Amino acid sequence: MRSTQRIGFRALLFAWLALVDTGFAVRACRSELVYFHKRGEAQLPATVEGTRIVLSLPDGKVELNRDVVRKLVPGFWPPSEWDSRRRQVHTSGVEERFATAWWAIENGLTTEVVSELREIHALDPKHAPSARMTAVLDRLAAPCIDPDFDRFQKALGVETRVARGPHVLLLHQHSDAEAEERIALLERVINGYHLLFAAQGLGLNVPRRRLLSAWFADQKDYLAFLRSEAAEAFSTTKGYFHPAWNAVVAYDGRSADPQRTARQKLSAKRDELQRYREMVDKAPARSRIKIKLGDAPVRTFGRTEAIQSLARIENEITCETMLLELDWRSVDLGTAAHEMIHQLANDSALVPRHDRFPVWLQEGLAAQFEVIRGGRWAGISRAHDLRLPDYRRLSSPLALERLVRNAGFGHGYNRELYAQAWALVYFLRTQHPQQFLTFIDLLRTPSLDDDSRVNPAGDRVFDAFGRAFGTDLNKLETEWHGFMKTVKTPLEQHAAGSS
């Protein structure tokens, strides 16, 4: 087990206390929390240009009339804040600069932070966390070779194309742009994972071969692959790390409900809108025009009013389409990040043997990396826009002891159990970071089985949990549930009122 000095815990604790995801951020930037009148909200870069609002998505900009927006709140977009935060601490000491770098890592800026980490290490070569982090960056910079993937590619049962990143090989059925976006996100996740554990003093292996992943265009092909691998237990999942192939498989959520049905409805609305446009264009100036779109009631307009009404409807359809696109990215890219953590845990030997970590810990840790905001990876241990509502809806959550003993896990995907796993790891990692690292260390230590009075896996984990966090589980459970009642996403914190 590592001592506090080896982990550099004082520096890390300074960073953690400053950066726990409370949602507070520098406000001196454009609006990034956007609340819409009819439905939905989004966290993404937005600028107001006269009567228009321009929203930035990963694949381009979307323009909307300002009147669809109920409220705008500036801030909460780390890429916009990074340069100013870095300038503010440029002349400060190593600890403060490291805290800012740690903020960047936990907010997904794992590419942007590299030069700052190297500067910190140059200023103080004895600063242990930054020394380990620059060392792992050097090792990550070494070229990777391709894995042997011919057999896996054939086993997929469909034609796929090959795309590569420095550490990722993706077999896909998508456009080059979509494949590149997915790979870029996964590369950020890989950097974040290795920087996180390097800072904490865990010496892990870095990829020597590109990590293999497959992305089906259609859910039915994903399900067919699972059946061919006798993995039907995972048929309710959107992605799966296959340990025998050492590869991730996932499918495009646009091929399945609710995305598929919602997109079909929007497409039908657009077709209706176009037909009404053509009708209005041909109508005499003084005519009265009846318009009915979708489930809306029939309304009668003059020609000028009809033109204005159709423009409003087009604006609403554009807004709905954008929100649907953001929902798709949140789930699909979040799944890709989640499964990448399982793959990295295996590749890096964080989990030396598959049964060393309980399922709740493996899934809860992977969920710390799956938050997507504005279509971009949001970083590590963020207040989870998808898991947090699931956790709040739990009617009968597992008692902490049963959860630690892995009760209910190991039978495929269970949304409620995974929400609890995310919430527990989120709490332990952010509120008890040193004990959490001790727990990880104990589980990775081969001698634990010999030291423990009982050897079955559930008891071994429970014993390690007690050593790390203490034996008063009732007190810890009360603290956990109390903490989770305070957790809010940035969008939740500012939802009330209007601007």
Question: For the regions a protein language model found, what residue spans apply to each?
Answer:
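Bacterial N-terminal signal peptides that target proteins for export
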Residues: 2-12
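Bacterial N-terminal signal peptides
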Residues: 10-21
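Compositionally biased alpha-helical segments
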Residues: 21-161, 169, 176, 184-188, ...
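Solvent-exposed coil/turn segments that connect beta secondary-structure elements
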Residues: 39, 47-50, 58-60, 67-74, ...
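Extracytoplasmic/secreted envelope proteins and their assembly/folding machinery
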Residues: 52, 98-101, 114-117, 183-190, ...
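Acidic/His/Gly-enriched intrinsically disordered linker/tail segments
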Residues: 72-77, 154-156, 232-248, 310, ...
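Sec-exported extracytoplasmic/periplasmic mature domains
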Residues: 102-110, 118-126, 135-139, 191-202, ...
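Juxtacatalytic substrate-recognition/specificity segment
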Residues: 159-353, 358, 448, 460-461
